[in-house]
Curated annotation (Swiss-Prot):
The gene coding this protein: pgi
Name under which the protein is recorded: Glucose-6-phosphate isomerase
Cleaved signal peptide residues: none
EC number: 5.3.1.9
Pathway in which this enzyme or protein is active: Carbohydrate biosynthesis; gluconeogenesis; Carbohydrate degradation; glycolysis; D-glyceraldehyde 3-phosphate and glycerone phosphate from D-glucose: step 2/4
Organism domain of life: Bacteria
Taxonomy of the source species: Bacteria, Pseudomonadati, Pseudomonadota, Gammaproteobacteria, Vibrionales
GO CC term, one of those recorded: cytosol
Keyword Isomerase attributed: yes
Length: 550
C-alpha cells in the first residue's frame, strides 16, 4: 500500500522552502549566461524519437536535487512498485490500478487477488482484433447486407475523451471507417451526429462499464430508436450495436448480442481506459495494428518509469518541476500547448486526466490538506493560442508554466507551413524565457525614428519581463507509438505528483454529488408545479425554467 507521508513534514520540503528564498529570484537569462552547458544538463531524450528540454525552467541542479530528495522521502519508488505489482493503491474503492497491464506487451504476469490478469487481457485484445478486422474489411454486414461505413462511439468521460483524442491525433492512419463520438446528454449532440448517417451502414459502440451511466444510456436508447425507426425489427439491433461493458444481462436486454460485448475490469479507471476495450473505437479508426503500436509506445514508457532511477526518469522530472511551481512559486495552472493540429484534444484529455486525479483536498489519512494539490490544466493548439490567450502568459500577472509539444516531421508537408509553425514553436519559448528589455524596445523605437516623447508613452507596454518557465517536448513525428509514449508520460507524471501530495489519485468522488442531486431534481421537472424544496436560488432557477418552457 501507499505510505501516508505528509510532504510538508519532510526534511526535503523544509530544504526546498529555504532554497526558495533564493530561487524565487532566479532569472533565466542569468542561468543561461552562467552555464553554457545548461541545455545539455537540463534536457533528456526518450528513445530515439522524443526530446524533453526542461532547461527553460526556474531551477538549478541544486533545486532538482532537493526535489529528488522530496520524491525519495515520500517513498515514490516504493509507490511505483506498488502500482505495477497490483497492490490495491486505490484504497477508497479497494482496487488495484493496472492500466499498465492493458499495454503489458512483455506479457509478464500481473497478479490481482492471486490471479494473473494477462490471459484475460490478451483474450479481450484477440476478440477486439477479430471484430475490428471484420468491420474494416467489410466482411461484417448490416441488416440489409451493406458494409458498415460509420462508427458512432457513445460514452462520456474516459469512455469518450481518450478515444476521441487518440482518433483525432492519429487521423493520418485512418481506415475506411468514419468515426463519430457522442457524449453529451444534450440531445443536440446525438441529433446532429446522426443527421448525415444511414442506419443501414452505421454501427454503434455503447461504452459503459455498468450499462447504467445516465448520459450514455440516454444517448444509446435514442440511437436505438433512430435505428429502429428505419430498420423496424428489434432483431436487427444485434448487427448494428456492440457494447463495451461488464453487465451482460443489461447488454442482452438492450438487444446486443453478448458475443459483441467487450469487457474490462474494475482495476481500469475511466480516465485510463483507452488502453482497454474502451479503445475499440481507436482500433476501428486506425486499424488494430496501429492500436497495438499505441500500446507498445505506452509500454516503453511504463518500463522506463518502473526501472529508471529518479534522476533520469522523464515522468518524475516533469512531475517534480510542476510541483515546484505549484507548491513553491504559487502557480495555479499549467498550459499544454501542442503545435500539431491533430493533437487539438490533447490538453482537454489531460484536463480530465490531471484534474479528476489530483483535484483532491483530503490526504491519504483522511485529513484536510493544508497545501496545494492538483493544478488547473488547460490549453489549445499553437499557433491558435498565440492569437487568443498568450498575451496573459507573456505579460499578465499570473505565472503559468507551459508545456510546448511539436513534431519535427509533419504528416502534411504543404509548402512552408511546417517551418512557419515550428518557427513559432521555438520563438515562443525563447520569448517567454528571455523577454524583451526596455533598452531593446528603446533601440527599436529609435531605429524607427520615434521621438523621446513617443517612446515615453509606449515603452512600458512593449517590455516583456520574460522569466516565464516552459518545457519543450520535441517529437520526431506523431505516430501511434510516439503518441503512446506521450500519453503514458503524462499519466505517470500525474501519478508521481499524487504520491508526493499524499492523496488518492485514482478515485473521483467529486463527480458524485452533482449526479445524486440531478437524479433528485429530474422528477421535479416532469410537470409545471412550482418547486420550493431547494434553496431559494435553485427553486428560482427551476421555476423560471418551467415558466420559460410553458
Amino acid at each position: 500500500m501507499l505510505k501516508n507521508i505528509n510532504p510538508t513534514e519532510t526534511q526535503a520540503w523544509a530544504d526546498l522552502t529555504a532554497h526558495f528564498e533564493t530561487a524565487q529570484n532566479f532569472n533565466l537569462a542569468d542561468l543561461f549566461s552562467a552555464d553554457a552547458q545548461r541545455f545539455d544538463k537540463f534536457s533528456t531524450t526518450f528513445g530515439q524519437d522524443i526530446l524533453v528540454d526542461f532547461s527553460k525552467n526556474l531551477v538549478t541542479e541544486e533545486t532538482m536535487q532537493k526535489l529528488f530528495s522530496l520524491a525519495e522521502q515520500t517513498e515514490l519508488s516504493e509507490a511505483i512498485k506498488a502500482m505495477f505489482s497490483g497492490e490495491k493503491i486505490n484504497k477508497t474503492e479497494d482496487r488495484s490500478v493496472l492500466h499498465t497491464a492493458l499495454r503489458n506487451r512483455s506479457n509478464t504476469p500481473v497478479i490481482v487477488d492471486g490471479e494473473d490478469v494477462m490471459p484475460a487481457v490478451n483474450a479481450v485484445l484477440e476478440k477486439m482484433k477479430a471484430f475490428t478486422e471484420r468491420l474494416i474489411s467489410g466482411e461484417w454486414k448490416g441488416y440489409t447486407g451493406k458494409e458498415i461505413t460509420d462508427i458512432v462511439n457513445i460514452g462520456i468521460g474516459g469512455s469518450d475523451l481518450g478515444p476521441y483524442m487518440v482518433s483525432e491525433a492519429l487521423a493520418p492512419y485512418k481506415t475506411r471507417l468514419n468515426m463519430h463520438f457522442v457524449s453529451n446528454v444534450d440531445g443536440t449532440h446525438i441529433v446532429e451526429t446522426l443527421k448525415p448517417l444511414n442506419p443501414e451502414t452505421t454501427l454503434f459502440l455503447i461504452a459503459s462499464k455498468t450499462f447504467t451511466t445516465q448520459e450514455t444510456m440516454t444517448n444509446a436508447h435514442s440511437a436505438r430508436d433512430w435505428f429502429l425507426a428505419e430498420a423496424g425489427d428489434q432483431a436487427h439491433v444485434a448487427k448494428h450495436f456492440a457494447a463495451l461493458s461488464t453487465n451482460a444481462e443489461s447488454v442482452s436486454e438492450f438487444g446486443i448480442d453478448t458475443d459483441n460485448m467487450f469487457e474490462f475490469w474494475d482495476w481500469v479507471g475511466g480516465r485510463y481506459s483507452l488502453w482497454s476495450a474502451i479503445g475499440l473505437s481507436i482500433a476501428l479508426a486506425v486499424g488494430f495494428d496501429n492500436f497495438v503500436e499505441l500500446l507498445e509506445g505506452a509500454h516503453e514508457v511504463d518500463n522506463h518509469f518502473a526501472n529508471t532511477e529518479l534522476e533520469n526518469n522523464v515522468p518524475v522530472i516533469l512531475a517534480l518541476i510542476g510541483l515546484w511551481y505549484n507548491n513553491f512559486h504559487g502557480s495555479e495552472s499549467e498550459s499544454i500547448l501542442p503545435y500539431d493540429q491533430y493533437l487539438h484534444r490533447f490538453a482537454a484529455y489531460f484536463q480530465q486526466g490531471n484534474m479528476e486525479s489530483n483535484g483532491k483536498c483530503v490526504d491519504r489519512n483522511g485529513n484536510p490538506v493544508d497545501y496545494q494539490t492538483g493544478p488547473i490544466i488547460w490549453g489549445e493548439p499553437g499557433t491558435n493560442g498565440q492569437h487568443a490567450f498568450y498575451q496573459l502568459i507573456h505579460q499578465g500577472t499570473k505565472l503559468i508554466p507551459c508545456d510546448f509539444i511539436a513534431p519535427a516531421i509533419s504528416h502534411n508537408q504543404v509548402g512552408d507551413h511546417h517551418q512557419k509553425l515550428m518557427s513559432n514553436f521555438f520563438a515562443q519559448t525563447e520569448a517567454l524565457a528571455f523577454g524583451k528589455k526596455e533598452e531593446t524596445v528603446r533601440a527599436e523605437f529609435a531605429a524607427a525614428g520615434k521621438t523621446e516623447a513617443e517612446m515615453a508613452e509606449l515603452v512600458a507596454f512593449k517590455v516583456f519581463e520574460g522569466n516565464r518557465p516552459t518545457n519543450s517536448i520535441l517529437v520526431k513525428k506523431v505516430t501511434p507509438k510516439t503518441l503512446g509514449n506521450l500519453i503514458a508520460m503524462y499519466e505517470h507524471k500525474i501519478f508521481v505528483q499524487g504520491v508526493i501530495w499524499n492523496i488518492f489519485s485514482f478515485d473521483q468522488w467529486g463527480v458524485e454529488l452533482g449526479k445524486q442531486l440531478a437524479n433528485q431534481i429530474l422528477p421535479e421537472l416532469a410537470d409545471d408545479k412550482a418547486i420550493n424544496s431547494h434553496d431559494s436560488s435553485t427553486n428560482g432557477l427551476i421555476n423560471a425554467f418551467k415558466a420559460f418552457k410553458a
